């Protein structure tokens, strides 16, 4: 519709059916300025509302706190008492056969699939960034500030990520591994980890 209107006006101007009075008319310029502004506002307001609605999950099934350190991650499952661990990269010399070099960790983040997960992210020392591209997640970890992101996994699997903020000499040795499992498996894993950490 817009292209046809522009072509129509261009044709009229080329055929000189628009006089110089109508081309230089301030009323036309005023309409051409105000009308697009109104259209842009009408498009922007609902878009901003939807953007903010997508940003935060009101009632997540699980809240996880990720704390970046030089050069490892600490995870705290805030819905459980005493369920936290440090996650370090497995050195190449200790890597089991078939695992990914520089991407495998000694303790994976395990989450139930098909559940809304909120991750609260911060740092204990310098800037870090918790990024898992296959989940569409990248959030900066800033000392003294809590940032949050959320995701839902729709299938079981293992999702790899990295710290994506240059944080020092061993920046590339801060992998993130998220394992999505069915709810019964997650419940077994969390009870086993809670029991072993309380001993």
Curated annotation (Swiss-Prot):
Its EC number is 7.1.1.9. Keywords: Copper, Electron transport, Magnesium, Membrane, Metal-binding, Mitochondrion, Mitochondrion inner membrane, Respiratory chain, Translocase, Transmembrane, Transmembrane helix, Transport. Residues 55-199 are mitochondrial intermembrane. Its cofactor is Cu cation. Binds a dinuclear copper A center per subunit. NCBIfam families: CoxB. This is Cytochrome c oxidase subunit 2. It comes from Apteryx australis. The gene is MT-CO2.
